[in-house]
Amino acid sequence: MKPTLTFIHSPDPLYADNQNYGVEFMPLWVFNLSSNLNNKENYNITLYDSRIHKIDNMVESDIFIFSGIDQDLHMINSVQENLRTRYPLSKFIIGGPITWSFHKAKSLYLLKEFDQIIIGDGEDIISEVIENNLNNK
């Protein structure tokens, strides 16, 4: 059976409504990262977008991959906590602008519940990160 990778897009709705004037942006980071996976045909790849899907309908995944901006922290942590409780054997990875800025602000401890934090261009290392997590390295 193919391993399942679930990309999680969970923007803070208040920030999106007030700062983005209600404009909902497609999570292009998911397509960018998944297109950089080696042997992507060996995975079941899904996208969860909290603006569309209900968290209670999410199914188990081998790896949940998150990204976001600083303002999404509350939503990201809420979704991650819910999924970790339901799927304790899954791996949880986070990257994107939130990790870079938290690293610069010495605030990475706010993401301590994740199994792996990626800082920098995930496109270059996504395949290695996925394989290492699937092989418990």
Q: Where would I find each of the regions flagged by the language model?
A:
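Glycine- and acidic-residue-enriched helix-capping/strand-helix junction motifs
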Residues: 14-30
